[in-house]
């Protein structure tokens, strides 16, 4: 039996048009839509509203369902506290959190996470992902862990997971270099294996350090590698209940974006949820390949200052995804187009595309953001019932 996770989960979001979307504890909600429609703003709203009731733009309000596990227990398990007399102070990834003897009771009574938000909500915007890759200060093996790299540096469970996940996308491992000095950079390269004999272990350690010094370091690489690694560093910490991930495909080649979708879907437990904004068909395909039952799609459009929403829930998505013809077609690309033409055959797609191209050249006729896709005659009805956004 899985023990109850401390914190809670977002069980409902209410959009600015009054529509409500119920959310399960393990749902992965994906926001899609054109630029400036409100995808990223939705994540910002959720992050702000999870702390306290506040003005918002796209998401009007959220409902948080809390668990009964004391937050003092999870804080003590995540970080070493500093006794301040009448309370204990914790540093959680740069966020200071204090616990008094009455804190657990007040937390349970409040509708929001308040000052403990960043213990349960991981807000992964682009800036957070890039900067988290910077080497943290070195600590003793049993010192206070204030950075995700500290966990990978001193716990083999985290180190191995981080390296294996990185290798899936880039074909090479990463290693925290605890011998670097005052900092712990992540080094890119094959894990060091010393086979020669040394006169003592100190000599072996010095040789190990000298080899790692020749490796490239993650924080000095391009934004694609840093963004990918940044997401991994947060996913690695399993005490988070909810992840807000803004455009995880940023700076990534499409194959790596698909792998990122797979890793997110595989890593999040049944007591973790995510809200993701994306322009990437590959992110969605990666998620669907590993956890189709967990996916909800919210397509956001905007006319002037008015948002409109179309929602595709778990059951409808799974039914469409389980059809082999649709699964291996480009139907997922329809989520990112304004118009979709369903064709019986590939030759029909080509013919209509040629006609459209001709009309665009000869007149002012423009069919914006149109996708021609092959679905076959048999699955038309299913698509019209379940996949029209």
Stretches found by the model and what they are:
Residues 1-55, 198-333, 349-353:
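Switch/communication elements of ASCE P-loop NTPase nucleotide-binding domains
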Residues 45-140:
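Conserved P-loop NTP-binding catalytic core
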Residues 2-6, 12, 123-242, 254:
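Extended helical coiled-coil dimerization/tether regions that scaffold
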Residues 61-64, 179-186, 281:
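Short, glycine/charge-rich beta-strand/loop segments that flank catalytic centers
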Residues 29, 144-149, 245-248, 337-339:
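Glycine- and acidic
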């Amino acid at each position: 039996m899985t023990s109850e996770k401390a914190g809670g989960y977002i069980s409902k979001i209410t959009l600015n048009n009054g529509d409500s979307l119920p959310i399960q504890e393990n749902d992965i909600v994906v926001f899609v839509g054109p630029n400036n429609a409100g995808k990223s703003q939705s994540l910002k709203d959720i992050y702000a509203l999870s702390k306290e009731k506040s003005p918002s733009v796209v998401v009007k309000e959220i409902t948080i369902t809390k668990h009964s596990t004391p937050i003092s227990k999870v804080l003590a398990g995540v970080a070493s506290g500093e006794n301040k007399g009448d309370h204990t102070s914790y540093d959680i990834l740069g966020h200071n959190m204090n616990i008094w003897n009455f804190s657990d009771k007040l937390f349970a009574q409040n509708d929001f996470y308040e000052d403990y938000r960043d213990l349960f909500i991981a807000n992964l915007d682009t800036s957070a992902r890039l900067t988290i890759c910077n080497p943290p200060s070195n600590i003793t093996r049993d010192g206070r862990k204030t950075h995700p790299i500290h966990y990978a540096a001193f716990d083999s469970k985290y180190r191995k997971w981080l390296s294996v996940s990185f290798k899936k996308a880039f074909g090479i491992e990463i290693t925290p270099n605890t011998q670097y000095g005052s900092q712990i950079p992540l080094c890119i390269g094959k894990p060091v294996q010393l086979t020669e004999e040394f006169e003592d272990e100190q000599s072996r350690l010095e040789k190990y350090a000298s080899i790692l010094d020749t490796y490239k370091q993650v924080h000095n690489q391009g934004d694609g590698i840093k963004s990918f690694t940044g997401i991994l560093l947060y996913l690695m910490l399993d005490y988070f209940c909810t992840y807000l991930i803004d455009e995880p495909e940023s700076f990534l080649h499409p194959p790596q974006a698909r792998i990122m979708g797979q890793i997110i879907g595989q890593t999040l437990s049944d007591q973790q949820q995510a809200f993701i904004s994306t322009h990437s068909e590959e992110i969605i395909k990666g998620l669907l390949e590993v956890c189709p039952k967990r996916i909800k799609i919210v397509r956001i459009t905007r006319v002037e200052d008015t948002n409109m929403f179309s929602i595709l829930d778990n059951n409808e998505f799974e039914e469409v995804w389980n059809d082999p013809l649709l699964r291996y077609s480009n139907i997922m690309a329809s989520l990112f187009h304004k118009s979709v033409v369903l064709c019986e055959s590939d030759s029909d797609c080509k013919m209509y595309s040629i006609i459209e191209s001709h009309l665009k050249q000869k007149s002012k006729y423009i069919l914006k953001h149109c996708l021609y896709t092959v679905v076959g005659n048999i699955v038309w009805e299913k698509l019209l019932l379940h996949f029209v956004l």
